[in-house]
Amino acid sequence: MVDLVYGRGITDIVREIPLYASIFKKFVGIKFFHTKPALYGSADIINVCNLHCSHCYWWLNRKDENQDLSVEDWRQTIRKTFKKQNLFVVTLVGGEPTMRPEIIEVFCQEMPRRVCVVTNGYFPLKRFEKLYFYWISLDGTEKAHNTIRGEGSYAKTKSNILEYIKGPPRNGKPAWKDIWITMTINTVNYSTALDLAEEWVGKVNKIGFQFHTPFMKGDPLWLEFGKLRNEMVDKLIDVRRKYPDFVINSEKQLSLMKRNWGGKGTTPIQCPSWAILSLDHMGRVKQPCCIGSADNKASKPICEDCGLGCYSVLVANGISGA
């Protein structure tokens, strides 16, 4: 199978022609009629995580709710939301989504090759036949990553990645193509971003960078706008030019990270938060975006300081406006 577009081969593209037609209609509506349809989805499939990372938004609003949706509950939710709205790709998050492999399997059954899993990679990576790919969170090189996620966590995740890519091809492609790395840049790890890219280029498929988004002013992890951040972005652009097939961010998207592109205060303005339908672990819609909460009284991300990759990529491609 030829790997044509972000891991999708000829067979995938032919099978998905009706879906592409639906997406095209959505883009026409957005551009010419100012409609606001959801394009992608995200789902917190579990309310538990094995780590307590210092920068993680999820713990801020987590409530001690032991109940999660069952397999069949999720199946019905998928059909009534993501599939009904013809969303192209759904990203599974948490908590730690790999702790509920049966739910990942349901998503893969319902939306084959259109499901990504964001994981800390602490547990062995299971091979799902119909998975799109894994996003593995690495917060810089080993020392910085361990500072954020706990001693020994980098070695554990690295070992699981390397073990996975030793495996046989999946869907006609080598296993390393299933692994994409995501790094959230903050004041602790920003100086290691380039080294992380150099460490993993040629070993995994892609790397994507985003910046820490604060929920409060004065957040010590937020790399504030200004000279240091601008220099960091310029270095990332250089890495993109050096490895255009490895760094997933475009130059335009990276350049957005030098300034406010999202909104005012906690209100989305330029950010197309409507473009991603985000559900929590009970299937409730999260507001104002994928790192928000279904609880209107919960803490909200500061849109004017946003560094999220999933929304900035849309703005960079001309989709904007709340």
Question: What spans do the regions from the language model cover?
Answer:
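A structural signal for short, well-ordered beta-strand segments
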Residues: 41, 45, 134, 181, ...
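The −1 position to Zn-ligating cysteines in a subset of zinc-ribbon hairpins
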Residues: 48, 52, 270, 302-305
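Extracellular/secretory pathway and lumenal proteins
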Residues: 53, 60, 227, 275, ...
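Membrane-interface junctions of multi-pass transporters
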Residues: 280, 284-322
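Conserved alpha-helical substructure of the radical SAM core
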Residues: 2-130
